[in-house]
Amino acid sequence: MVDRYWRGSAQDEVMQDEHGFIWRAMLDMVDADLSGSKVLDAGCNRGGFLRLLSDEASIGEGFGYDPAPGAIEDARRLAGTLPLTFETSESVPQGWSGFDVAFSHEVLYLLHDLPSHATAIYGSLVPGASYFATIGVHADSALMTTWHDDNAIALDLPGPYRLDDVAGVFKATGFDVAVGRLPFRFVPVDAHRGDVTDSRLSSWLDYYSRDKVMFRFSKPG
């Protein structure tokens, strides 16, 4: 963490701006009507995804947590009068429960204790609710394995996890597990390409079309 942010104030702002096309692909995967729902965003950073859900999916209320206090301060400021609540926390804050749906984007690969995360999310959901978790940084992605090797020490990363490892943890927690590839239409040519040694556009297209996936972890009704 840098200066109370994940990568620094300016870098976190750029990161959130770059994620718009990913968030919309995530929403295209959701097989439920989100209008009026109570939504949890695990690892919300500056709250951009919940603002999108409030503006475009008409959610009833949104709750986001993140360990970076500077990002949470920004999230509260940027939310304005939207029905959004943000807290600085490493896990689901105490007392947060009754969620109809939960989301995370590139959070699972950061977690040293994946079973505890799965248990916390499971306990926060109502029966029949789903947790949609997107992950591209995993051991089954050649591009991201290289990135992980280059950044593991600086960012204190576990793993990398294999997709089978992730699925196994959530299945053992009690979730019904499904997974799919995100339906990207167009990918901005500059999206994240400066983050890794291999900046070839073909490599990034392969990453987005094949390696970046969304899990659906459903709590039985």
Residues covered by each model-derived region:
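Class I SAM-dependent methyltransferase SAM/SAH-binding core
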Residues: R46-S91
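Short catalytic micro-motifs in class I SAM-dependent methyltransferases
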Residues: E106-L110
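A short glycine-rich, Lys/Arg-flanked "PGG" loop and its adjoining helix->strand segment in the class I
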Residues: P115-P127
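A conserved beta-strand element that flanks and buttresses the S-adenosyl-L-methionine
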Residues: F103
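Short alpha-helix
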Residues: L157-G174, G180
